[in-house]
Design a protein with these regions (language model features):
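Short, aromatic/His-centered strand-loop micro-motif at the edge of beta-sheets
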Residues: 132-161
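Secretory/extracellular carbohydrate-interaction modules
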Residues: 1-58
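Localized edge beta-strand/strand-to-loop motifs within extracellular or lumenal beta-rich domains
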Residues: 158-172
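Small/polar beta-strand repeat architecture
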Residues: 59-87, 92-130
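Conserved small/polar residues in nucleotide/adenosyl-binding loops
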Residues: 214-216
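Noncatalytic modules at the cell exterior or secretory-pathway interfaces
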Residues: 206-211
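Short, solvent-exposed beta-strand-to-loop segments that form ligand-recognition rims
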Residues: 181-203
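Short, surface-exposed terminal/edge motifs of secreted or surface/virion proteins that either
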Residues: 107-111, 171-181
Length: 216
């Protein structure tokens, strides 16, 4: 490890249990909640910003697509790939998640990984995976930065207990919570779905509870 600024001392004196905590970084995101590649609700921290996220894959893109086994080429009929998609977007074709690698035209694009179906899938709908991100500064109940109603200051360098409560059918609220200083949950952010959505925001409520670290 190379120092990028002058050190306060090169002969540090350690206490009983010296520790090093990493609280800021670039190029990676830590996520925790109930989610998979297509649906879910989770907290995330990217080394600088804490956020609450709702992931959906119910938005169908225009037209239909054709996918061939072991090929990364997706062709469309009546599609508008250039207008609706871009590189690094994620789409779902016949239940499988693919990352858009290149959009050649409104009717042709390339994805990764290759389509893994057994047979050619023609005339099928494709869905776009969307992440609805609410940054900490946008939390509508408590910004948990020491300035909210609870006075709680969320320190990403320390162990935290987080919570999420939701109704998966799409018309309920999603509440993002963290355990406060007095042991009670602090409600930080609420995402409203009632009188907002026209369909369920997730395809299933049967989601794994997981912690993930992804490189961006």
């Amino acid at each position: 490890v190379l120092a990028v600024q002058s050190l306060g001392s090169t002969v540090a004196e350690f206490e009983d249990q010296p520790q090093v905590s990493l609280s800021n970084w670039n190029g990676a995101t830590v996520r925790s909640g109930t989610f998979d590649d297509q649906n879910g609700i989770f907290w995330q921290y990217d080394g600088g910003n804490l956020a609450a996220v709702q992931r959906t894959s119910t938005r169908q893109i225009t037209g239909t697509v054709t996918a061939t086994p072991d090929s990364n080429s997706i062709t469309g009929d009546g599609t508008r790939f250039r207008e609706q998609l871009k590189a690094v977007d994620r789409i779902v074709v016949r239940g499988m998640t693919h990352v858009v690698a290149q959009v050649n035209s409104n009717t042709q694009m390339f994805v990764t990984p290759d389509y893994r179906g057994v047979n050619v899938s023609a005339g099928v709908k494709a869905c776009l995976v969307l992440d609805k991100v609410a940054k900490q500064s946008e939390f509508n109940l408590d910004t948990i930065d020491g300035n909210g109603p609870s006075g709680y200051n969320f320190d990403p360098g320390k162990m935290q207990m987080i919570g999420i409560q939701f109704s998966w059918y799409g018309a309920g609220f999603i509440d993002f919570m963290t355990r406060g200083s007095n042991g009670d949950f602090v409600f930080a952010h609420r995402m409203r779905n009632s009188n907002v959505n026209t369909e369920a925001f997730m395809r299933t409520g049967n989601q794994p509870v997981r912690l993930s670290l992804i490189h961006i």
